[in-house]
Amino acid sequence: LLGELVSVNARVVDIGSGAGLPGIPLGIARPDVEVVLIEPLLRRTKFLDEVVEKLELSNVTVVRGRAEEGHIQRQVGSADYVTSRAVAPLGKLAKWSAFYAAKGTILVALKGESAIEEILRDKQEVGRAGWRNESVIQLSGGEEVDDTFVVKAVHI
């Protein structure tokens, strides 16, 4: 789904990439998209570097650091989309994501069942970070897998 939401030749920053979701699958599915994976843990960045190298993903870059760190923000710069999967509560994520946003940047946060609750609870914090028009898309995981909720918002 993320591949379908992202425009042609877009730049995507994936905050707290962990094992590479959703950034690595996006890089595979969409070679036209530049993907920057931000991950603070050394062992995970080593793993991500290996995956990127083995799969020859020239459109994917791994950056070790925390999204809220100024030197990481300067190194990475702004993006058309900022994404994450189960990294932090929406309010905190909105603040971190704003560091990589320009006017029109789209936040795409993959969340669990708490997505709507987080939007209601963190609405002011999300707004202070410059995000508007929050919406939720529910994706069915089938019988064996929990549903995923995609929270979208636009930076103004």
Regions found by a protein language model. Name each.
Residues 1-9:
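Conserved alpha-helix/loop element of class I SAM-dependent methyltransferases that forms part
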Residues 9-18:
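Conserved class I S-adenosyl-L-methionine
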Residues 10, 32-156:
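S-adenosylmethionine
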Residues 19-32:
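Conserved SAM-binding loop of SAM-dependent methyltransferases across substrates and taxa
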